[in-house]
């Protein structure tokens, strides 16, 4: 694929992917995280956010709450959800395994970088674009 051809040509041990579809990301914060990763010993990292909701596995078993619990979507248990704002990984691992990281704890599980939900409006559809336009106009005024 084009991505793997490109990775073969890149002269770097690590790759950082940036999601250009999130226009409200704080540039200074992005740079701070990139600088942290470059100085760290972690082999991979990914931006995430906390998602509070009711989640079940494919067998319809609750995964973040006990049956009959009274839960709130604003103050209950949460799961980490990837935002893909920044994805940082070892180039050789991607080329050898065709994945960013193995998703197994400490083999090497990616470091999770918690991101503020206010910056994470992701523009993938026309509706998303209209939402971003509205938020942008509110911020500007």
Could you say what each language-model-derived stretch is?
Residues 112-141:
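Hydrophobic helical membrane-anchoring modules
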Residues 1-6, 14, 20-116:
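Conserved core of the sugar-phosphate nucleotidyltransferase
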Residues 19-20, 123:
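Conserved residues at beta->alpha junctions
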Residues 8, 35, 134-138:
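Short, well-ordered alpha-helices that flank and scaffold nucleotide-derived cofactor binding pockets
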